[in-house]
Amino acid sequence: MVHPVQVGKRTRMSFSKIKEVCEMSNLIEVQLDSYEWFLQEGLQEVFDDINPIQDYTGNLSLEFVGYKLDMENIKYSVEECKERDATYAAPLKVSVRLINKETGEIKEQDVFMGDFPLMTEQGTFIINGAERVIVSQLVRSPGVYYDVSLDKSGKELFSATVIPNRGAWLEYETDSNDIIYVRIDKTRKLPISILIRALEYGSDLEIIDYFGEDERLKASIEKDNTKTKEEALLEIYKRLRPGEPPTVDSAMSLIGSLFFDAKRYDLSRVGRYKFNKKLALHLRIANQISAQDIVNPATGEIVVQEGEKIDRDKAIEIQNSGINSVDIQLDDKVLRVIGNNFVDIKSFVKFDIDDLNIKEYVHYPTLKEILDNYSDEEMIKEQIKKNINVLIPKHIIRDDIMSTISYEIGLPYGIGYTDDIDHLGNRRLRSVGELLQNQFRIGLSRMERVVKERMTIQDQDSITPQALINIRPVTASIKEFFGSSQLSQFMDQTNPLSELTHKRRLSALGPGGLSRERAGFEVRDVHHSHYGRMCPIETPEGPNIGLINSLATYAKVNEYGFIETPYRKVDKATGVVTHDIIYMTADEEDHYLIAKANEILNDDGTFIDDKITVRDQEDVLVVPKEEVDFMDVSPRQLVSVATAMIPFLENDDASRALMGSNMQRQAVPLLKPEAPIVGTGIEYKAAVDSAVLPKAKKPGVVTYVSASEIRVKKDKPDSNGDVDKYKLLKFKRSNQGTCINQKPLVSKGDKVDTKTVLADGPSTDLGEIALGKNIRMGFITWEGYNYEDAMLISEELVREDVFTSIHIEEYEAEARDTKLGPEEITRDIPNVGEDALKDIDERGIIRIGAEVRSGDILVGKVTPKGETELTAEERLLRAIFGEKAREVRDTSLRVPHGEAGIIVDVKVFTRENGDELSPGVNKLVRCYIAQKRKISVGDKMAGRHGNKGVISRVLPEEDMPFLPDGRPLQICLNPLGVPSRMNIGQVLEVHLGLAASKLGWHVATPVFDGATEPEIVECLEKAGYEGDGKTVLYDGRTGEPFDNRVTVGYMYILKLAHLVDDKIHARSTGPYSLVTQQPLGGKAQFGGQRFGEMEVWALEAYGAAHTLQEILTVKSDDVVGRVKTYEAIVKGENIPEPGVPESFKVLIKELQALCLDVKVLNDDNEEIAIKELADDDMVELEVNIEGSEDYTEPKQPNDNYLEEEENKDKESDYDEDLNFDDLTKGLQLDDFNDEH
């Protein structure tokens, strides 16, 4: 039943039935851990891979010995970086050793290798002052993949692909004649036997001897016209290098460099792990009948007799005794199964080798050689260390290739299985660390080329490491990654939840991933392996659906990049569900039966029911309780954080839940945040991990609290003194222009622990996420103002500032050097009256606190005009008045159209103060304008269940429907928005909200484990309401009751970032496009509304000829006509006849460009001369109604947000996650040095 739960400083009444067994880990650890790995191991791996760099003679060799990030010399703090548009980074120092092998001379030096961007505690990077997030990428894991397709007759054809991390692909395929072909690196196909001959077994006999008798192999050999190893090598060389003279040696070295050279072919740790897992012998021989006695080669004892079934443990024992091929008996034939010769080192080396840190299987022949030649423990360890790259090879080896062929031969007989490429066991994450590592590797390999060249050119004796190394390629590739990679995105900072979600996002796009166009339905679809790893609900609508996902709440990423999810182990002996938590990847989970988290348990932890519903891969089965292997840890395990914040999610249709998840991320932080009455209990965790709240670093006592600072005296003083200071952010601008403001929660004398929340941030209330407001509402129509999801709101919401938010915009002006002299920031602006300068100080910059409207001057700036040859009089004036009379024009920064507000901050950067400015800039001024935006007609609002709508009317409070106790409703929603959309969760939320508000509760109803219908009825009755949650409503205008009782209660409603003030737009005259001379389009360009083809039809249909003519000419692109019209309107005369539209001239020119002789004739068939340029007719006007095409409103720095908003409205299927970085598509590195 309902029970109190302490969440931070608030007590919630929880309806959950299931006790939490597993702590949710830090929600942004996927970012933090990955970057930490990169600093500790990732960088070292790259240096190890490239060591040593030798010149072409092999005489000089350059080695990277070690590296460190110089944390002492970080130039600016995070806050300063944001202010100064700098990058938050630390200098990377690498110690380099240069060895001259002829003279034996060794030189060591520390080389500076550029500033390396650091991750902030929040899991973000500050790049050029903008906060960015690196999104994790979901890619296909390297490994061996088998696939099956059917030919025309319905026969199964098996194919395989061997995919490395980088390097040449191997593909096998079978045709209808049972011949197996191979393609090497996407070339034309060859019979498989050619590859086998070239690698090892030259003659037909050897091949059959090795692989065993098989019809398909024999058919392939027949097809093959080579008979020896040499012929096969030449054949392959001809295919791979057509046109070059083939020789056996060059063919050998070609194959060697294609597959067996670690520099060219890299499997990576994951690849090796997946290869060994797929090609392991024991998986294919388990549960098969042995066709002969299997003898352990070391002891000589028989492990399995002929005709005996090989069980799983025996199979593993056989593999780990070094046996690599086993014959198994099928119905009417014997099949040979060949592994890839990798074994568990622990079954051979009996002493402790944990310090060697070997987690993978090792290559048996190499290990055997070491063990045969050495017996001493230390020597064996030494040899293992020395040969680690042969024991665990980074590239593919012959044994791997032979094993993949053997697997292909066994598939038609049901030995082995085909793979599903959308399974999360075959897709992995590249997080920040790995993406950075790959980028760094590209930079280093470019640098390596430079070093080699310099080694050969420079004088061998005077050479130093510093002189050899050019760090430009390295710093450039890092800069390129952070600045323009598709995966480095401008952080979505609308509210704490959107920040958190952005850091937990998984994208299948980006370099080396999929492209939107190529991605089919299967990749985007929900897969059974997503359970507990990736949210099936949260994904954008539009072209990116299913390609961009969100990490589930409990998911973790393992060392190989596979996503794991926790399960509770069921003790098979006693039937008890233990508290042992085991994290499993998707392919491990496939072997087990897993019970749901809400399965009821006895007090001793055993299942109550005898039959249990379990998941088995994609099926749901009912099995006896003895067969269950694991159990989910929590019902919210399968969804993401945003989805877990929707109460009664189980009662909503999935597509509406998707909208609900996505719209919570667009909620604007309000002036007075208010936590939801009906929450799910995850609000506190989400807020604490989203990094918008200051948390205590060490336990202690609060000694000082002000609006901007909190000081905590630590219980145990350490090297940083005994007081921790926490600076609070006050009215800062977020990336999206919302307001970031923190206010203290603790008071003087409070005791705090580690991680105690000290202050509330934007959209948080007592440390819980608070995106919206609890609003008293009813499902009732009102005079048609609810039509099509519109919302009717009470004036109270405007008056009481319930939905008021603060928005801060940033504008900047820079004074540059021009060809004609420097620009100047000054109060002295030509042709501007004193009235316009009333709020401008003596520097020419607006004062803080001034109220500004559109068109007001923010920064006065003048630019020198082109000087003409001066006359004698002018020269005299110059001599008398000095420079004052110089020709300048006004280029001041003004408030753009439709913007207004109060100046809250002004920052000035100059060269004299030692600020770093971009070249040619002498002074930079930034102004911040804040606006309070009250809720108004046209704003978009939404609940948490995908029930969105636009405000249609603000009604006086006294006209709103009111309850029997006299309280008026605050919002009326349309009841028709519920049944067809099937998001019943909103109705249950309203009922529970009504009861909870009366009882004074805040409730938690976790997803899939929340309040049931009887519980809600009980709560309503406890609060003194009817069990159905309906009540009589009275019309506010007449006082009469409405005919039927109405559902009334409290719903949590959000105000979304689509505000009408940002969208409304009007234009009289403005900029025109250069070629067609038609007005530009869009708010950002201050454009006009297009009167398009269909609108023209409408006017034609009405026969409105004159209206149509002026719309197509003087109102659009008749250049002369529109100027004359403007003049006529100003002078009050009649509007003149229109001329020829510019676009008509363009059309004629286009036809002439196609070599068509086009003339324009009048009624009498006389040619009309069309003037090329309208300048002859141009009337000199006082008014400039022209604007140049490149006119745009002054841009806010790092903020393409307005345009994004603009495009959101243009496309109905707008994609929320298409970051504006996608504009830099052209710069993509298509893959990591990889042709595929």
UniProtKB/Swiss-Prot annotation:
Gene Ontology cellular-component annotations: DNA-directed RNA polymerase complex
GO annotation (BP), single: DNA-templated transcription
UniProt keyword annotation of Protein biosynthesis present: no
Region (Disordered) residue spans: 1185-1236
Pfam families: RNA_pol_Rpb2_1 (PF04563), RNA_pol_Rpb2_2 (PF04561), RNA_pol_Rpb2_3 (PF04565), RNA_pol_Rpb2_45 (PF10385), RNA_pol_Rpb2_6 (PF00562), RNA_pol_Rpb2_7 (PF04560)
Gene3D superfamilies linked: 2.40.50.100, 2.40.50.150, 3.90.1100.10, DNA-directed RNA polymerase, subunit 2, domain 6, RNA polymerase alpha subunit dimerisation domain, RNA polymerase Rpb2, domain 2
Cross-referenced InterPro entries: DNA-dir_RNA_pol_bsu_external_1, DNA-dir_RNA_pol_su2, DNA-dir_RNAP_su2_dom, DNA-dir_RNAP_su2_hyb_sf, RNA_pol_bsu_bac, RNA_pol_bsu_CS, RNA_pol_bsu_protrusion, RNA_pol_Rpb2_2
EC number: 2.7.7.6
GO MF annotations, alphabetized: DNA binding; DNA-directed RNA polymerase activity; ribonucleoside binding
Listed Acidic residues bias regions: 1201-1220
Subunit structure: The RNAP catalytic core consists of 2 alpha, 1 beta, 1 beta' and 1 omega subunit. When a sigma factor is associated with the core the holoenzyme is formed, which can initiate transcription.
Its biological purpose: DNA-dependent RNA polymerase catalyzes the transcription of DNA into RNA using the four ribonucleoside triphosphates as substrates.
SUPFAM superfamilies, alphabetized: beta and beta-prime subunits of DNA dependent RNA-polymerase
PANTHER family: DNA-DIRECTED RNA POLYMERASE I SUBUNIT 2
Protein name (record): DNA-directed RNA polymerase subunit beta
Species lineage: Bacteria, Bacillati, Bacillota, Clostridia, Eubacteriales
Keywords: DNA-directed RNA polymerase, Nucleotidyltransferase, Transcription, Transferase
Superkingdom: Bacteria
Reactions catalysed, as given in the entry: RNA(n) + a ribonucleoside 5'-triphosphate = RNA(n+1) + diphosphate
Protein family according to the UniProt entry: Belongs to the RNA polymerase beta chain family.
